[in-house]
Design a protein with these regions (language model features):
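Short, extreme N-terminal segment that most often corresponds to the first beta-strand
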Residues: 1-33, 192-194
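Charged interaction segments
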Residues: 48-194
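A common structural junction motif
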Residues: 26-34, 97-104
Length: 194
């Protein structure tokens, strides 16, 4: 397990007013004058001030991480963060407690230990399978779609199983000269229900 991992949160709201209030909590903390004067906070926001602005006492929660970026995509607030060791369940639960109309899904990516987790059991916001390269990621809801994409990449049929996809990519890259940046790795999210 890595010391720091990437976690993307997708806050999906049925009530846009609540979603905008949540966005405002991020924006307010991001544009806080006292924070802006401290060079350490030029590019990120700690979880604790956000939790405090939602009306919770940060010291009561395990909060190890910081928001790197956030933006709205329709009725979804996307939060890209770096966290300590694992997805920050307390951060997510504080948002859901403050705004019951918002469900927070996460995708936890730790390439160093090859572990990928999500709480999105339907794959609506974090599809289960994905091919990842240096600067491109393709998501797939089914193993068949992932296998079809790999078949196109390697130029031959690949059976729809994780082992066959791994083998096809390994064989393809061992027999072809491909820049590291252009190599794809196959990944699967493991669903955690909590």
């Amino acid at each position: 397990m890595s010391e720091f991992i990437s976690v993307t949160y997708k806050c999906v709201g049925s009530d846009l007013k609540d979603l905008f209030k949540l966005y405002e909590a991020f924006w307010t903390n991001d544009n806080n004058k006292s924070r802006k004067d401290d060079w350490r906070y030029k590019c990120c926001i700690d979880f604790a001030p956000i939790v405090a602005s939602l009306g919770f006492e940060p010291k009561q929660y395990e909060l190890h991480g910081e928001v790197r970026s956030y933006h709205l995509e329709g009725s979804t607030l996307v939060i890209d963060s770096v966290t300590g060791y694992c997805e920050q369940k307390d951060f997510r639960k504080c948002i859901e407690a403050k705004f019951p109309s918002i469900k927070v899904y996460y995708g936890e990516d730790d390439p160093q230990s090859a572990s990928y987790y999500t709480n999105d059991s339907n794959g609506d916001y974090f599809p289960k399978y994905f091919l990842e390269s240096y600067d491109n990621t393709n998501f797939f809801k089914t193993i068949e779609d992932a296998a079809e994409s790999v078949s196109t990449l390697v130029g031959s049929y690949v059976a729809p199983s994780a082992d066959d996809i791994y083998d096809a990519l390994d064989n393809y890259y061992s027999g072809n000269v491909v820049c590291m940046e252009d190599r794809y790795s196959f990944r699967e999210y493991e669903v955690r229900n909590d």
